[in-house]
Amino acid sequence: MGSRTGSREEHSLQFLNLTKMTTTTASNLPWVEKYRPSKLDELVAHEQIVKTLTKFIENRTLPHLLFYGPPGTGKTTTVLAAARQMYSPTKMASMVLELNASDERGIDVVRNTIVNFAQTKGLQAFSTSSNTGTVPFKLVILDEADAMTKDAQNALRRVIEKYTDNVRFCIICNYLASIVPAIQSRCTRFRFAPLDQKLIVPRLEYIVETEQLKMTPDGKDALLIVSKGDMRTVINTLQSTAMSFDTVSENTVYQCIGQPTPKEMKEVVKTLLNDPSKKCMNTIQTKLFENGYALQDVITHLHDFVFTLDIPDEAMSAIITGLGEVEENLSTGCSNETQLAAVVAAFFEAKRLCVKEMKNLEIEDMEF
């Protein structure tokens, strides 16, 4: 009797430990995965693409797909949501093959992994809102396919042709030009544009409310600015800031990502337009580099500010050309100090070009 009681208590303890471990694991999920939409109707953007895919699924006429567009715009999420709508949860693993071509980019992956998966046929029961039937094909999701070699892409083209009866392919990439025309012509193409801010805000506010975070209005604006239409960046930056600070504000967001704030950049632009070259160098080094900011990030923000300046086109061209050359030089490993001097020189050239039309380039009253 005592042995049975002890065994029961031990079993209960194991169950409690398992439950606790499962809860902890779920709470430790990155928010970008925790709040990833699982159904097509949960997506916040690309309404026309969702409607088209839903129609394909309902009619069981899904073609080969080619999703392209900037990172964080919902390409992978969309195809995974479509897969969940086609296949039951217990059969997803056997019916869907997801590969990241940036890790496995050679021809061997096509010849071995993909071909072995495509050779076996399977019938999978699935359900939609209106009917129940079978899907007589598997799904291969090839993410970041623009990293594949040309030989691998040509081999993939032959596999797509050979196994069309058994498999549907979804090719995902950032740059359409990196995909060989032979694959493009065999797929239905969908372009995923950067998300509009008004579509990001409801999802952002939902996460803030669910996680019980404190977020200021300027903090929300900062998240939208740094994301540039990338939902993944919004969520990852929000989580990082929330883990590091009590309040998500403009200062804490920029501090978390290690980039200069708009206020700091405005001071830099004023310095570049009004101060002597030596003072420019000293001021920028003090304000930016001592705070650990990278010159590459400074160039990116300068580019945004330059287009707000009311200066002649010739002067604008001189600045943009100079910044472009600096960015290229930085990518090849040139020193920050030398390239900072080149940035100062570009602004001084712009001032020289417009000195006849504008005696003073003060921007105290300019709004950014």
Swiss-Prot record:
Localization per record: Nucleus
SUPFAM superfamilies assigned to the protein according to its UniProt record, in alphabetical order: P-loop containing nucleoside triphosphate hydrolases (SSF52540), post-AAA+ oligomerization domain-like (SSF48019)
Major site of localization recorded for this protein: nucleus
Source domain of life: Eukaryota
Pfam families in UniProt: AAA (PF00004), Rep_fac_C (PF08542)
Keywords: ATP-binding, DNA replication, Nucleotide-binding, Nucleus
GO terms under cellular component: DNA replication factor C complex; nucleus
Assembly information from the UniProt record: Heteropentamer of various rfc subunits that forms a complex (RFC) with PCNA in the presence of ATP.
Family designation: Belongs to the activator 1 small subunits family.
Name of the featured protein: Probable replication factor C subunit 5
